[in-house]
């Protein structure tokens, strides 16, 4: 049997002509494409974030290329990127073999990219438009809730803060009155009228506590025993503690603003109910409402909002799209979560084709709904004489108007129509549940918008957009969470979370674009 020849190992041998990292990266490698695209971008906005103090920084183009390539491959943490620089030749090729620490990468993201993330996200979009991949003439809008990095037990509730603040103010006012009375009975000076006003804030309590403290020090020694003076000083100390606590409550209310909750460790996050509910008990968790617009499954716009419902995000989100690109898209498609009178009016003012569903869009097309004669949506309406006709043929005349205000401050006008003689009606038990004559509430403006939306949604173009919507933003969210494992934010604060999302959006778009071109 012939002797087996084994090639020698050269691991520990020195080479006179060592290979470069360039030799290990194929010419058509994705990392070369990413690096080429990133280096074609304008670097000035990123350079403007450096102050020129201290040691020379690493190349911003190199760092941007490194971070974007990491996000393309699902590596989002600074430690993960730093580890990849040790073991992955593609990352080594980007940095020329430099071993960057996680702190260097973190400073680049948190101190520099955070200030110009929109510029570079837009730069990627410009490349996609130039290549003809997207046109910015259509946008498919949807939202999802992404959990914050904060713990789920760090909640602060607005109602609880307001209740505790009111109780503490009431308790403090009573204690303050008792202290002032005790000072007066023991020879203290009279309380000025302006200092006798009820306390309504932490500053008021602190001012009153200092006044009482000064007067307590000037009391005649013969008037109070040592124990009584100690008790008085303790009561005054409690006033200062109450002032500090009230200051905390007021700070919490400032952070809350119009929100109902926030997280102590991530004050920008709001507690919301998420679909990922392992205990199935409806538990709320700190999260952000992420809104994105897509075209051909590319991100074209993104924003974060503190409110859990999508209705209030529609207008500011489209305004941001207009600000980002200097124009609105010709059409927008969204689900029924965005269908409101305010949003339809906005689309009309912007002259956009809005393929936006409304509540009951699907339900009102079902046979039981259409054949329900007692449903006010099926009542005959005489537009000329402004009256409805009930199932018994009785006219329902207008009897007043009401105004409702949404959370955004938008005012809607509701007209009331009431039948005149419902007593003894054979259909009364089927037609109404309350006593008296039946009253219906009608928003004519919203109904007109709904009719217009129905015609758009059921048109040939509308059917096309409706069939496209489930495979646009919803598919993107599926890829984002299931394929790229981006399910929870890794930063505290709106600015850093937004920066992280921007980098993810850049990576997502480039990953899809490069995948198409290969």
Predicted regions and their residues:
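Secondary-structure junction/capping motif
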Residues: 20, 28-29, 59, 266, ...
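Secretory-pathway/luminal and periplasmic proteins that interact with or process carbohydrate-rich
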Residues: 91-96
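Hydrophobic alpha-helical membrane-insertion signals
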Residues: 1-32
